């Protein structure tokens, strides 16, 4: 993912294609690494924590690469970063309240990065960022509603 962020940031002639392919490949390995850890019995709280932190760092780096590469308006990129982090925070805070939000919302991290990779590859990065803003915003609201509903049910 960091390699795709670098490619996007350099603004290379085929940067959207190369960056998108790198993003798809890194997404595949990100998906597989957790499954391998579970299958081999090598999961740990530290590994889970570091995986989540590096996922967020990589996601922000990708958006910053798009910003530096000039692929989308700065305000859209910043909004995408803010909403993406808020979606993750909403889940983390709900988890701390013993409310599970995995799978809640139409725009989890994998979906957001898939939009960036695929729509970016075909040459429409700014619309891809707009789609990310919309689905991240919807996901944030969905998670807030589900969390509020669960809190209300627990206190009744």
Place the predicted regions along the sequence by residue.
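Membrane-embedded alpha-helical segments that form the functional core of polytopic membrane enzymes
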Residues: 1-46, 74-79, 124-135
């Amino acid at each position: 993912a960091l390699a795709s962020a670098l490619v996007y940031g350099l603004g290379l002639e085929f940067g959207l294609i190369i960056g998108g392919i790198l993003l798809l490949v890194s997404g595949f390995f990100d998906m597989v690494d957790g499954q391998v850890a579970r299958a081999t019995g090598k999961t740990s709280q530290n590994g889970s924590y570091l995986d989540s932190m590096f996922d967020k760092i990589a996601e922000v780096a990708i958006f910053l690469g798009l910003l530096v590469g000039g692929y989308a308006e700065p305000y859209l990129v910043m909004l995408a970063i803010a909403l993406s982090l808020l979606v993750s925070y909403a889940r983390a805070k709900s988890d701390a309240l013993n409310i599970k939000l995995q799978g809640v919302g139409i725009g989890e991290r994998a979906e957001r990065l898939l939009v960036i990779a695929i729509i970016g590859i075909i040459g429409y990065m700014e619309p891809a960022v707009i789609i990310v803003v919309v689905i991240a915003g919807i996901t944030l609201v969905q998670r807030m509603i589900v969390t509020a509903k669960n809190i209300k049910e627990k206190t009744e």
